[in-house]
């Protein structure tokens, strides 16, 4: 969750990147926004009559690739730098082969990356960035809704579909035959399935954008408050506008959906950049433009495979202009029109009436315009964990960062090849061994009673309700006596010791270390994992009078 503002002007932009069991939404990388003492974007709420509508992915604010894949996500960035509040998560498709001793097989082709930012303009004004990449499959759907209210678009030549629903012009609302044919199933509470939402969106209009476009909601009963979504780039995706309501009957709402649809040869790549603003009266933003086309070989150069780095210019009504850059490859120096050079994960260069006022660089080494700006020696700090005090949740890392006290109150990342976790630092100090960082949360994430052993396996009959979602992939299993510790590849009928890290973990050795009847602990991290945090810099430039 990203937070900004004070008092009645507090705002929060959040993203769901975890997984849970039971009564849940299909909401991987779904986002929400709260501002002006109101919920602006969010879930559709509790299911009406136990209907599948509220939990279906189409009714969230996210994207899906088809064929559908099971995904889990990890936090990649959290940072506050001057007017910028930034977060990013990466979702990856996977196959669960833990029970056969093969661990989780993570897909290189099927993934999603979503970067969010709140950018402050004043005490009560702000805008948000949503930078979204989808890879995999041969068809992508990006789905978005706000609230009820008068709706208008700019930059779209919408063509009305002749009847039907999003499922097709010949498919009536809630058509049973279509749902059955497309893999949905019927239960006591009605139909459900991945494509359930398609025959429940109607009044379909379509457009192929030729440039920047926007959608504006005059929110109902909101004292003149507008929500505007501006999309400077859609990677040639089709835009679809529909109406939607709860199919459970007596729906309390009817409102607009905006979707984007892209098809191609697998693995398809879609990159969407969008800017969100709230305003009363006149819009906060005058215009948004991409820095050239945003395809895989855009002017900012290639980034991760199939995608180009982001470059946007946001012109505000108050005379301020923000030039924004983002990439996953923080080491490549990129040039952009206007004399810009950028190497980093995120950068913002603000000018007021043509004069530089603020420069922000996150996870990078350079953001300059004609030589003016920020340069640093390295994009991030990275060091191995050399000691863990589990009683106090304190890790020691060496070599120590230049100023470990500056980490207090900020998030660091604990990583290994299978795991990346965000932890807030509560205390920091240094000694001869390195930097000691006390972390906020209990690192114990599971416990099980030992029931037996196998080679590379500590067996347990204890149920782990969150297994299967990669929560334990790359975690540590620790004996009751705390004399033995191993990195594991997952849990399925016990903890599987990772053979790539521990070549020798025979059953007899594990039986000695983990006696039957004792309880082992599963911990988030251990010695040998790395602690990482992006370097963050924000410079305010004094204005000459």
Sequence positions of predicted segments:
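Short amphipathic beta-strand/extended segments with alternating polar/hydrophobic composition
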Residues: 11-18, 40-45, 113-115, 143-145, ...
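Short, hydrophobic/aromatic-enriched beta-strand segments in well-ordered soluble domains
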Residues: 144-146, 225-234, 238-246, 270-281
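Non-catalytic terminal regions with compositionally biased, polar/charged low complexity
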Residues: 261-271, 277-545
């Amino acid at each position: 969750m990203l937070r900004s503002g004070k008092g009645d002007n507090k705002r929060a932009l959040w993203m769901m990147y975890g997984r849970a069991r039971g009564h849940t939404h299909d909401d991987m990388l779904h986002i929400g926004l709260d501002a002006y003492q109101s919920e602006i974007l969010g879930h559709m709420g509790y299911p009406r009559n136990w209907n599948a509508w509220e939990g279906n992915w189409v009714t969230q604010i996210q994207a899906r690739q088809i064929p559908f894949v099971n995904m889990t996500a990890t936090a990649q960035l959290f940072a506050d730098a001057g007017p910028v509040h930034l977060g990013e998560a990466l979702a990856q498709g996977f196959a669960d082969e833990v029970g056969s001793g093969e661990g989780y097989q993570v897909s290189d082709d099927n993934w999603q990356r979503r970067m969010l930012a709140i950018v402050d303009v004043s005490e009560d004004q702000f805008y948000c960035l949503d930078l979204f990449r989808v890879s995999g499959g041969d068809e992508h759907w990006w789905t978005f809704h706000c609230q009820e209210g008068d709706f208008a678009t700019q930059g779209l030549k919408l063509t009305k579909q002749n009847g039907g629903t999003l499922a097709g012009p010949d498919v009536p609302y809630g058509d049973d035959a279509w749902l059955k044919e497309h893999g949905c199933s019927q239960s006591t509470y009605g139909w459900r399935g991945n494509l359930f939402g398609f025959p429940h969106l109607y009044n379909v209009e379509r457009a192929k954008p030729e440039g920047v476009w926007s959608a504006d909601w005059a929110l109902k009963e909101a004292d003149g408050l507008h929500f505007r979504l501006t999309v400077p780039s859609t990677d040639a995706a089709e835009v679809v506008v529909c109406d939607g309501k709860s199919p459970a009957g007596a729906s309390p709402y009817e409102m607009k959906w905006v979707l984007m649809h892209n098809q191609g040869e697998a693995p398809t790549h879609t990159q969407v950049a969008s800017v969100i603003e709230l305003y009363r009266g006149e819009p906060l933003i005058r215009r948004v433009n991409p820095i050239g086309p945003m395809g895989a070989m855009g002017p900012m150069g290639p980034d991760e495979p199939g995608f180009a780095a982001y470059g946007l210019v946001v012109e505000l009504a108050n005379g301020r202009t923000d030039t924004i850059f983002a990439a996953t490859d923080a080491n490549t120096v990129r040039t952009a029109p206007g004399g810009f050079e950028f190497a980093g994960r995120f950068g913002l260069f603000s000018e007021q009436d043509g004069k530089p006022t603020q420069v922000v660089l996150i996870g990078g080494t350079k953001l300059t315009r004609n030589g003016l700006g920020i340069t640093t020696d390295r994009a991030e700090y990275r060091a191995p964990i050399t000691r863990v005090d589990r009683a106090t949740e304190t890790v020691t890392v060496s070599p120590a960062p230049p100023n470990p006290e500056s980490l207090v109150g900020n998030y660091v990342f604990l990583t290994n090849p299978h795991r990346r976790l965000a932890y807030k630092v509560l205390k920091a100090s240094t000694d001869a061994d390195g930097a000691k960082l006390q972390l906020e949360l209990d690192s114990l994430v599971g416990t099980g009673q030992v029931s037996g052993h196998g080679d590379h396996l500590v067996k347990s009959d204890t149920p782990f309700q969150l297994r299967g979602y990669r929560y334990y992939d790359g975690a540590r299993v620790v004996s009751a006596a705390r004399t033995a510790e191993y990195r594991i590849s997952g849990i399925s009928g016990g903890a599987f010791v990772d053979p790539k890290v521990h070549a020798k973990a025979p059953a007899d050795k594990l039986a000695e270390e983990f006696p039957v009847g004792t309880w082992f602990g599963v911990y988030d991290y251990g010695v040998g994992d790395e602690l990482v945090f992006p370097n963050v810099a924000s410079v305010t430039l004094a204005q000459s009078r």
